[in-house]
């Protein structure tokens, strides 16, 4: 058990103060078009105050069309950046690493935001259509842009969530 409390060093040299990681939990606390709310900010920072060495965000869509739930934290728009800077400043002051989980809801997207559901192939059960080559290229670019945005907002790492094809 004591191993959990020991420092964790990643292959790139980055160190976490312990091996406790907050898993990505979507709790729909950021209803203002993806901007981090005070509730979500407090919820995440309280975990760092409680001793977690690594805090991972909820799944954040890389495109507005990738929103899966109302109140989902976003990273797809520059207007989201201020909240991410503020969050990371606080997490780092609490000696916690921060990881941004980025995704697209795909066949589970909320059609109120996306207009339709897309996937790598037709999914009649989820009423999803097959993505075009152009949409695949747009998606790849969106993941790259959001990974760069996360890095610029001082996240220590990125996790790619790709379960909703």
Q: What feature does the model see in each segment?
A:
Residues 97, 103-155:
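Non-globular sequence segments
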Residues 151-165:
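Active-site groove signature of glycoside hydrolases
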């Amino acid at each position: 058990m004591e191993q959990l409390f020991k420092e964790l060093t990643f292959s790139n040299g980055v160190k976490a103060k312990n091996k406790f990681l907050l898993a990505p939990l979507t709790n729909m606390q950021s209803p203002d078009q993806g901007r981090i709310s005070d509730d979500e900010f407090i919820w995440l920072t309280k975990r760092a105050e409680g001793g977690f060495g690594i805090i991972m965000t909820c799944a954040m869509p890389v495109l507005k069309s990738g929103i899966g739930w109302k109140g989902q934290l976003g990273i797809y728009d520059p207007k989201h950046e201020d909240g991410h800077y503020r969050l990371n400043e606080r997490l780092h002051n609490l000696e916690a690493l921060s990881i941004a989980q980025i995704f697209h809801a795909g066949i589970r997207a909320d059609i109120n935001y996306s207009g339709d559901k897309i996937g790598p192939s037709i999914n009649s059960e989820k009423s999803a259509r097959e993505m075009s080559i152009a949409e695949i290229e747009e998606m790849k670019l969106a993941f790259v842009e959001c990974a760069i945005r996360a890095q610029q907002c001082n996240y220590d790492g990125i996790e790619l969530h790709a379960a909703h094809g």
